[in-house]
Amino acid sequence: MPKIVVLVKFTPDLTGDRSFLADGTVDRLSVAGRLSELDEHAAEQALQVQESCAGSELVYLTMGPDGATDALRKALSLGGDAAVHVRDDALHGSDAFATSLVLAAAIGRLGFDLVLTGMASTDAGMGVVPALLAERLAVPQVTFAGRLTVSGGTVEILRDSDTVSETVAGGRRAGSSGLLTHRGRLR
């Protein structure tokens, strides 16, 4: 049974007013938030993969304050089987390195065959967490995935960037639990 993990992030609504805490971080409890739009693309792709792989399990994973549960609820409303929220006050204001460490540990505990993420979060837009996760999980990363299909243990991804379209295929290898890819791009 393939296990698909989709990372989702609760981000502040960019159209609303924001306030900041004394440490310079956004006060996420005082602003309206939402599921990052780019993570919705990953969720939609995961649902398509789940439909094509009988018996697969789709789990959403997030890290953040209490409000991050709203992102999980939104993702689950699209479909999927379960959601996991890593929440600890000690993680407040974590940078990309700490975030990738915590998420990699959570993914390791969950187990996975495929991890999907948005290409970046809509709040910071750095896009570095997926690459850090791939390194920590010792799996390849494929960026700008436009279409993803799974058949017989092989994952085929159409990469579509501004300059080139190409197909990348891979399967499970010794020492590798899966493939990390991220979906969507800024337009």
Predicted regions and their residues:
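N-terminal glycine-rich FAD/FM-binding segment characteristic of electron-transfer flavoproteins
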Residues: M1-R187
